[in-house]
Protein backbone atom coordinates (compact mmCIF):
# COMPACT_ATOMS: atom_id res chain seq x y z
CA UNK A 1 0.00 0.00 0.00
CA UNK A 2 1.21 3.49 -0.83
CA UNK A 3 2.20 5.49 2.26
CA UNK A 4 -0.36 8.17 1.34
CA UNK A 5 -3.25 5.92 2.37
CA UNK A 6 -1.77 4.30 5.47
CA UNK A 7 -3.71 4.55 8.72
CA UNK A 8 -2.47 4.88 12.27
CA UNK A 9 -2.70 1.12 12.81
CA UNK A 10 -0.51 0.24 9.84
CA UNK A 11 1.99 2.96 10.75
CA UNK A 12 2.20 1.65 14.32
CA UNK A 13 2.78 -1.88 13.04
CA UNK A 14 5.48 -0.84 10.56
CA UNK A 15 7.24 2.03 12.33
CA UNK A 16 6.28 1.64 15.98
CA UNK A 17 3.74 3.49 18.14
CA UNK A 18 6.17 6.31 18.98
CA UNK A 19 6.89 7.31 15.37
CA UNK A 20 6.02 10.89 14.43
CA UNK A 21 6.18 12.09 10.83
CA UNK A 22 7.48 15.54 11.80
CA UNK A 23 8.31 17.38 15.05
CA UNK A 24 6.04 19.90 16.70
CA UNK A 25 6.96 23.39 15.49
CA UNK A 26 9.49 22.01 13.07
CA UNK A 27 9.72 23.30 9.50
CA UNK A 28 6.78 21.30 8.13
CA UNK A 29 4.50 22.11 11.06
CA UNK A 30 5.28 25.83 10.87
CA UNK A 31 4.59 25.85 7.11
CA UNK A 32 1.24 24.14 7.71
CA UNK A 33 0.35 26.68 10.40
CA UNK A 34 1.37 29.60 8.18
CA UNK A 35 -0.65 28.31 5.22
CA UNK A 36 -3.67 27.74 7.48
CA UNK A 37 -3.43 31.29 8.83
CA UNK A 38 -3.10 32.81 5.37
CA UNK A 39 -6.09 30.77 4.19
CA UNK A 40 -8.30 31.78 7.14
CA UNK A 41 -7.39 35.47 7.00
CA UNK A 42 -7.65 35.59 3.21
CA UNK A 43 -11.13 34.05 3.08
CA UNK A 44 -12.29 36.19 6.02
CA UNK A 45 -11.17 39.40 4.26
CA UNK A 46 -12.85 38.29 1.03
CA UNK A 47 -16.02 37.50 2.97
CA UNK A 48 -15.97 40.86 4.73
CA UNK A 49 -15.81 42.77 1.45
CA UNK A 50 -18.48 40.68 -0.26
CA UNK A 51 -22.17 41.39 -0.77
CA UNK A 52 -24.81 39.57 1.27
CA UNK A 53 -25.52 37.10 -1.54
CA UNK A 54 -21.81 36.42 -2.07
CA UNK A 55 -21.34 35.89 1.67
CA UNK A 56 -24.08 33.29 1.61
CA UNK A 57 -22.37 31.46 -1.25
CA UNK A 58 -19.03 31.55 0.55
CA UNK A 59 -20.57 30.14 3.75
CA UNK A 60 -22.29 27.38 1.79
CA UNK A 61 -19.01 26.65 0.01
CA UNK A 62 -17.14 26.33 3.31
CA UNK A 63 -19.87 24.00 4.60
CA UNK A 64 -19.61 21.80 1.50
CA UNK A 65 -15.82 21.77 1.84
CA UNK A 66 -16.15 20.59 5.45
CA UNK A 67 -18.51 17.75 4.51
CA UNK A 68 -16.34 16.74 1.54
CA UNK A 69 -13.22 16.76 3.71
CA UNK A 70 -14.82 14.51 6.32
CA UNK A 71 -16.21 12.20 3.62
CA UNK A 72 -12.79 11.94 1.96
CA UNK A 73 -11.24 10.46 5.10
CA UNK A 74 -14.09 8.01 5.66
CA UNK A 75 -14.08 6.85 2.03
CA UNK A 76 -10.29 6.64 1.94
CA UNK A 77 -10.17 4.39 4.98
CA UNK A 78 -13.14 2.30 3.83
CA UNK A 79 -11.92 1.76 0.27
CA UNK A 80 -8.46 0.69 1.46
CA UNK A 81 -9.91 -1.73 4.02
CA UNK A 82 -8.64 0.23 7.01
CA UNK A 83 -11.90 1.58 8.40
CA UNK A 84 -12.72 0.85 12.03
CA UNK A 85 -14.92 2.39 14.72
CA UNK A 86 -12.34 5.07 15.52
CA UNK A 87 -13.13 6.77 12.18
CA UNK A 88 -16.72 7.50 13.15
CA UNK A 89 -17.18 11.31 13.13
CA UNK A 90 -17.61 11.51 16.90
CA UNK A 91 -14.70 13.66 17.98
CA UNK A 92 -15.81 17.15 18.98
CA UNK A 93 -14.34 18.66 15.82
CA UNK A 94 -16.11 16.10 13.63
CA UNK A 95 -19.40 16.78 15.40
CA UNK A 96 -18.85 20.48 14.76
CA UNK A 97 -18.81 19.77 11.03
CA UNK A 98 -22.48 18.86 11.38
CA UNK A 99 -23.16 21.82 13.68
CA UNK A 100 -21.82 24.00 10.85
CA UNK A 101 -24.15 22.25 8.41
CA UNK A 102 -27.12 22.70 10.74
CA UNK A 103 -26.33 26.37 11.19
CA UNK A 104 -25.98 26.92 7.43
CA UNK A 105 -29.42 25.39 6.96
CA UNK A 106 -31.23 26.94 9.95
CA UNK A 107 -29.19 29.98 11.11
CA UNK A 108 -29.47 29.19 14.83
CA UNK A 109 -27.79 31.38 17.47
CA UNK A 110 -26.97 28.43 19.72
CA UNK A 111 -25.00 26.91 16.83
CA UNK A 112 -23.08 30.14 16.31
CA UNK A 113 -22.32 30.43 20.02
CA UNK A 114 -21.07 26.85 20.30
CA UNK A 115 -18.96 27.17 17.18
CA UNK A 116 -17.43 30.42 18.40
CA UNK A 117 -16.78 29.35 22.00
CA UNK A 118 -15.76 25.72 21.45
CA UNK A 119 -14.95 25.15 17.80
CA UNK A 120 -12.48 28.00 17.33
CA UNK A 121 -10.29 27.19 20.36
CA UNK A 122 -10.65 23.43 19.88
CA UNK A 123 -9.72 23.43 16.20
CA UNK A 124 -6.97 26.02 16.71
CA UNK A 125 -5.47 23.96 19.53
CA UNK A 126 -5.60 20.87 17.31
CA UNK A 127 -3.57 22.72 14.67
CA UNK A 128 -1.08 23.95 17.26
CA UNK A 129 -0.75 20.57 19.02
CA UNK A 130 -1.70 17.93 16.42
CA UNK A 131 -2.50 14.40 17.58
CA UNK A 132 -2.37 12.84 14.10
CA UNK A 133 1.41 12.76 13.51
CA UNK A 134 1.75 8.98 13.87
CA UNK A 135 1.45 8.47 10.09
CA UNK A 136 4.25 7.78 7.57
CA UNK A 137 4.75 11.38 6.37
CA UNK A 138 3.10 14.78 6.01
CA UNK A 139 1.95 13.70 2.54
CA UNK A 140 -0.76 11.32 3.76
CA UNK A 141 -4.53 11.44 3.58
CA UNK A 142 -4.83 11.61 7.36
CA UNK A 143 -2.41 14.53 7.80
CA UNK A 144 -3.75 16.56 4.87
CA UNK A 145 -7.34 15.93 5.97
CA UNK A 146 -6.57 16.88 9.56
CA UNK A 147 -4.85 20.15 8.67
CA UNK A 148 -7.48 21.23 6.15
CA UNK A 149 -10.56 20.34 8.17
CA UNK A 150 -9.32 22.07 11.33
CA UNK A 151 -8.45 25.19 9.32
CA UNK A 152 -11.98 25.14 7.89
CA UNK A 153 -13.43 24.67 11.38
CA UNK A 154 -11.63 27.79 12.59
CA UNK A 155 -12.70 29.66 9.46
CA UNK A 156 -16.44 28.94 9.63
CA UNK A 157 -17.17 30.64 13.00
CA UNK A 158 -14.74 33.44 12.15
CA UNK A 159 -16.98 34.18 9.15
CA UNK A 160 -20.01 34.27 11.44
CA UNK A 161 -18.36 36.93 13.60
CA UNK A 162 -17.22 38.87 10.52
CA UNK A 163 -20.85 38.84 9.34
CA UNK A 164 -21.89 40.51 12.58
CA UNK A 165 -22.69 37.76 15.07
CA UNK A 166 -21.90 38.99 18.58
CA UNK A 167 -21.03 36.26 21.10
CA UNK A 168 -22.32 36.67 24.64
CA UNK A 169 -20.97 35.21 27.88
CA UNK A 170 -24.60 34.85 28.96
CA UNK A 171 -24.90 31.99 26.48
CA UNK A 172 -21.94 30.12 28.01
CA UNK A 173 -24.30 27.76 29.92
CA UNK A 174 -25.76 26.66 26.56
CA UNK A 175 -22.25 25.99 25.28
CA UNK A 176 -21.37 23.93 28.36
CA UNK A 177 -24.66 22.03 28.13
CA UNK A 178 -23.82 21.07 24.55
CA UNK A 179 -20.27 20.05 25.47
CA UNK A 180 -21.07 17.93 28.51
CA UNK A 181 -24.33 16.67 27.04
CA UNK A 182 -22.47 15.26 24.05
CA UNK A 183 -19.44 14.07 26.04
CA UNK A 184 -21.43 11.92 28.46
CA UNK A 185 -22.83 9.36 25.98
CA UNK A 186 -19.53 9.33 24.09
CA UNK A 187 -17.65 8.51 27.30
CA UNK A 188 -19.74 5.37 27.69
CA UNK A 189 -19.62 4.58 23.96
CA UNK A 190 -15.81 4.60 23.94
CA UNK A 191 -15.52 1.52 26.13
CA UNK A 192 -17.39 -1.07 24.01
CA UNK A 193 -16.02 0.35 20.73
CA UNK A 194 -12.45 0.64 22.07
CA UNK A 195 -12.28 4.21 20.76
CA UNK A 196 -11.01 7.47 22.22
CA UNK A 197 -13.50 10.10 21.07
CA UNK A 198 -13.16 13.41 22.95
CA UNK A 199 -9.92 11.85 24.33
CA UNK A 200 -11.98 10.45 27.21
CA UNK A 201 -10.82 6.81 27.09
CA UNK A 202 -7.07 7.34 27.43
CA UNK A 203 -4.60 10.24 27.32
CA UNK A 204 -2.13 8.77 24.85
CA UNK A 205 -1.15 10.35 21.54
CA UNK A 206 -2.25 13.86 22.44
CA UNK A 207 0.04 16.59 23.75
CA UNK A 208 -2.63 18.23 25.90
CA UNK A 209 -3.99 15.09 27.57
CA UNK A 210 -0.43 13.84 28.08
CA UNK A 211 0.26 17.06 29.99
CA UNK A 212 -2.86 16.45 32.09
CA UNK A 213 -1.55 12.95 32.84
CA UNK A 214 1.82 14.25 34.02
CA UNK A 215 0.06 16.67 36.38
CA UNK A 216 -2.84 14.55 37.60
CA UNK A 217 -1.93 10.96 36.80
CA UNK A 218 -3.55 8.64 34.28
CA UNK A 219 -6.51 7.88 36.53
CA UNK A 220 -7.55 11.52 36.88
CA UNK A 221 -6.28 13.14 33.67
CA UNK A 222 -9.87 13.84 32.56
CA UNK A 223 -10.16 16.41 35.37
CA UNK A 224 -7.62 18.52 33.50
CA UNK A 225 -10.30 19.32 30.93
CA UNK A 226 -12.26 21.37 33.49
CA UNK A 227 -9.74 24.21 34.04
CA UNK A 228 -8.75 24.03 30.37
CA UNK A 229 -12.36 24.60 29.29
CA UNK A 230 -12.71 27.44 31.81
CA UNK A 231 -9.57 29.14 30.49
CA UNK A 232 -10.69 28.71 26.87
CA UNK A 233 -14.11 30.24 27.55
CA UNK A 234 -12.57 33.14 29.47
CA UNK A 235 -10.21 33.89 26.60
CA UNK A 236 -13.00 33.70 24.03
CA UNK A 237 -15.45 35.88 25.95
CA UNK A 238 -13.10 38.38 27.61
CA UNK A 239 -12.81 40.71 24.57
CA UNK A 240 -16.60 40.93 24.30
CA UNK A 241 -17.07 41.52 28.04
CA UNK A 242 -14.46 44.31 27.93
CA UNK A 243 -16.07 45.82 24.83
CA UNK A 244 -19.52 45.78 26.47
CA UNK A 245 -18.13 47.39 29.64
CA UNK A 246 -16.50 50.18 27.64
CA UNK A 247 -19.70 50.74 25.67
CA UNK A 248 -21.73 51.08 28.88
CA UNK A 249 -19.15 53.47 30.37
CA UNK A 250 -19.42 55.75 27.34
CA UNK A 251 -23.18 55.91 27.80
Language-model-derived ranges and their functions:
Residues 46-59, 105-113, 163-173:
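Membrane-interface helix-boundary motifs at transmembrane edges
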Residues 29-35, 81-93, 116:
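Structural signature of hydrophobic alpha-helical transmembrane segments
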Residues 1-56:
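N-terminal topogenic module of multi-pass integral membrane proteins
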Residues 30-48, 66-71, 183, 226-239:
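Hydrophobic core of alpha-helical transmembrane segments in multi-pass integral membrane proteins
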Amino acid sequence: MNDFWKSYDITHAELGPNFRCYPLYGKIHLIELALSLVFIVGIALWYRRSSASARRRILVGVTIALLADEAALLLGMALTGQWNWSYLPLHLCSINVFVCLYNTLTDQNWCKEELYALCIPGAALALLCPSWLDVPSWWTLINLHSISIHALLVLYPVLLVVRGYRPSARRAPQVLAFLFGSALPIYFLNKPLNTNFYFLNNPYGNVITSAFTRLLGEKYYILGFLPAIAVALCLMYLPWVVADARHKKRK
